[in-house]
Amino acid sequence: MPRRREVAKRVILPDPKYGDRVVAKLVNIIMLDGKKSTAEKALYGALELASEKVNEDPVKILKKSLDNIKPMLEVKSRRVGGSTYQVPVEVRAERRVSLAMRWLVKYANDRSEKTVTDKLAGEILDAYNNRGAAVKKREDTHKMAEANRAFAHYRW
């Protein structure tokens, strides 16, 4: 972590099919062992499946799903006088999106469908309808922050 100057954020180019940076970022999160084309196939297939079921633009479905997963608050550990408190803090906009994407992919992989495409499509549709494990994770995160509201004055 350099002290002299702010490190420039790497720019992610929009994906080739939808021309959207959010989709490109999600492809990068899904990707394993550098197999980007496999990750793209899985995500594009999932978005097509989702758009067939809802009859809406695939990118709109994805963005609404991510909006339903994004956490507004989270807790961070803060040590004060020998005891550790879970202090609720607001989540930065960039982190909200990346957490939402990570949770979406994580809980999609935990699903019981056969293919990755089906798993992703299922989790995207569940998030779109405010259901599913990723949305539950957001709710749990918010509950945790709400429960520890008394320690909010320890924010830094």
Swiss-Prot record:
What Pfam family is a match for this entry? Ribosomal_S7
UniProt KW keywords: Ribonucleoprotein, Ribosomal protein, RNA-binding, rRNA-binding, tRNA-binding
Give the transmembrane region(s): none
Molecular function (Gene Ontology), one example: rRNA binding
Carries keyword Cytoplasm? no
User: What is an annotated GO biological process for this record, any one?
Assistant: translation
Q: Can you cite an annotated GO cellular component?
A: small ribosomal subunit
Q: Which InterPro entries match?
A: Ribosomal_uS7, Ribosomal_uS7_bac/org-type, Ribosomal_uS7_dom, Ribosomal_uS7_dom_sf
Its biological purpose:
One of the primary rRNA binding proteins, it binds directly to 16S rRNA where it nucleates assembly of the head domain of the 30S subunit. Is located at the subunit interface close to the decoding center, probably blocks exit of the E-site tRNA.
Tell me the protein family, please: Belongs to the universal ribosomal protein uS7 family.
Assembly with partners or alone: Part of the 30S ribosomal subunit. Contacts proteins S9 and S11.
By its UniProt entry, which NCBIfam families does this protein fall under? rpsG_bact
- What protein is this chain from? Small ribosomal subunit protein uS7
Q: Which organism is it from?
A: Geotalea uraniireducens (strain Rf4) (Geobacter uraniireducens)
> Mind giving the lineage of the organism this protein is from?
Bacteria, Pseudomonadati, Thermodesulfobacteriota, Desulfuromonadia, Geobacterales
Q: What gene name is given for the protein in this entry?
A: rpsG
